[in-house]
């Protein structure tokens, strides 16, 4: 796989040293929240100019600025309405309660921090709660803890994209932000939002064959939200048994490698038999749709987008390593199976399908041969406009509108947390 010039691992230091002023610009864009159309319009204008301008440092600067501004604006999106009013559910208030207890020094020891997290939100992943505890000690209100955690998750995703391709990173970033997943992750699924960012970084390291670092970051992701462990398990299975590049397990002469391939084929055969009946599949789909649950609808939306991403990759003959394609296929199969037989698990796993096809989109702009720069800019512009329309539709239909009048704090629910 061909990538642009690699970015150093200390990406945050590079951003601050070379583009420190852009962070300030992104912060300033979020100030006039009483007039939310202005900062959002300015951010989109910067991204459009970055697409249309010729190559050069100015284009890179605008791309970086628009990406950071998008992250910060979406950080403040949820606080612009009441948490429950915006369709985010009661879990958001449970997280706020945990942040409030952290700030009031109700818990001090590591064990107390975990107990507070489990009691408030029902999840005992230590990495997330220790991170939340550290952030809570730096700010006065649960609102700021919430916003900083969202910003951290967005910047982790952005860093992974920035390291993969520097020229069109903003296009892929906008495409990622335009889907329903990030809106959901910023609501009741704040733990998984941070985990998604860590998984993206782990996948980037895995692509670069930095296996030790990828494993370390992957463990951090699993410690942030347990559903990330399923993705790591699928990746490990593909790397150990199906990849041509990793150790003795991949050699045809290795009996363990052959056993691994046989095991994978057996699993696929069982899955094919289980899903071989059209009546069975249709009955499961109808049962899921008739449950009248808010999660089932967007779960199938993610499944459709995952299939479209696969078609997109094969249609344009994406130059991805074989193990990456197999990993994505096995993971989508796992998600489809769990969505039928274990809906509570499947709804969480499907969010990680974005990690794969964001990588597909990153590679897309550098893998296509025989195209002029103008053609690539045209494709980028079309993708950008499509993602903008999709974002407006999703937010307006499912989250009662993005553009609201008044300040950020004024729209929050009254209560002890604010």
UniProtKB/Swiss-Prot annotation:
Gene this protein is translated from: epsF
Family: To S.marcescens SfuB.
Source organism: Ralstonia solanacearum (Pseudomonas solanacearum)
Alphabetical keyword list: Cell inner membrane, Cell membrane, Membrane, Polysaccharide transport, Sugar transport, Transmembrane, Transmembrane helix, Transport, Virulence
GO CC aspect terms: plasma membrane
Main location as per UniProt: membrane
Sequence intervals crossing the membrane: 21-41, 45-65, 142-162, 170-190, 222-242, 262-282, 296-316, 326-346, 347-367, 377-397
Role played: Probably involved in polymerization and/or export of exopolysaccharide EPS I which functions as a virulence factor. May play a role in export of EPS I or its intermediates across the membranes.
Recorded superkingdom: Bacteria
Membrane topology category: Multi-pass membrane protein
Pfam family for this entry, one: EpsG
GO biological process, one term: polysaccharide transport
Protein name: EPS I polysaccharide export inner membrane protein EpsF
Localization in the cell: Cell inner membrane
Tagged with keyword rRNA-binding: no
């Amino acid at each position: 796989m061909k990538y642009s010039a690699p970015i150093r691992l200390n990406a945050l230091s590079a951003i601050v040293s070379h583009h420190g002023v852009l962070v300030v610009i992104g912060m300033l864009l979020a100030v006039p929240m009483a007039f939310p159309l202005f900062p959002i319009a300015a951010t989109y204008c910067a991204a459009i100019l970055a697409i249309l301008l010729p190559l050069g440092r100015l284009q890179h600067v605008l791309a970086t600025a628009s990406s950071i501004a998008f992250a910060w604006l979406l950080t403040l999106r949820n606080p612009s309405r009441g948490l429950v009013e915006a369709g985010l559910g009661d879990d958001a208030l449970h997280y706020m309660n945990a942040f409030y207890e952290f700030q009031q020094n109700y818990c001090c020891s590591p064990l107390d921090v975990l107990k507070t997290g489990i009691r408030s939100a029902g999840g005992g992943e230590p990495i997330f709660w220790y991170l939340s505890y550290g952030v809570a000690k730096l700010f006065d209100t649960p609102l700021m803890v919430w916003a900083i955690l969202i910003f951290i998750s967005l910047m982790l995703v952005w860093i992974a994209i920035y390291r993969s391709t520097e020229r069109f990173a903003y296009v892929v970033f906008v495409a990622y932000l335009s889907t329903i997943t990030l809106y959901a992750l910023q609501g009741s699924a704040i733990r998984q939002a941070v985990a998604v960012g860590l998984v993206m970084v782990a996948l980037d390291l895995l692509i670069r064959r930095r296996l030790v670092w990828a494993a370390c970051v992957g463990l951090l992701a699993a410690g942030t939200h347990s559903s990330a462990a399923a993705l790591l398990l699928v990746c490990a299975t593909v790397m150990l048994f199906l990849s041509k590049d990793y150790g003795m397990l991949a050699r045809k002469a290795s009996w363990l490698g052959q056993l691994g391939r046989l095991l994978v084929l057996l699993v696929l055969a069982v899955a094919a038999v289980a899903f071989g009946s059209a009546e069975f599949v249709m009955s499961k789909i109808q049962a899921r749709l008739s449950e009248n649950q808010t999660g089932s609808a967007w779960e199938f939306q993610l499944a459709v987008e995952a299939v479209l991403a696969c078609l997109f990759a094969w249609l344009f003959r994406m130059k991805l390593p074989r193990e990456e394609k197999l990993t994505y296929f096995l993971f989508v199969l796992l998600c489809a199976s769990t969505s039928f037989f274990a809906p509570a698990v499947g709804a969480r796993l499907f969010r990680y399908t974005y990690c794969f096809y964001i990588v597909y989109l990153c590679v897309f702009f550098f893998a296509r041969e025989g195209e002029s720069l103008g053609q690539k800019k045209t494709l980028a512009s079309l993708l950008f406009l499509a993602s903008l329309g999709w974002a407006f539709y999703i937010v307006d239909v499912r989250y009662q509108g993005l553009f609201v009048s008044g300040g950020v704090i004024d729209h929050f629910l009254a209560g002890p947390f604010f």
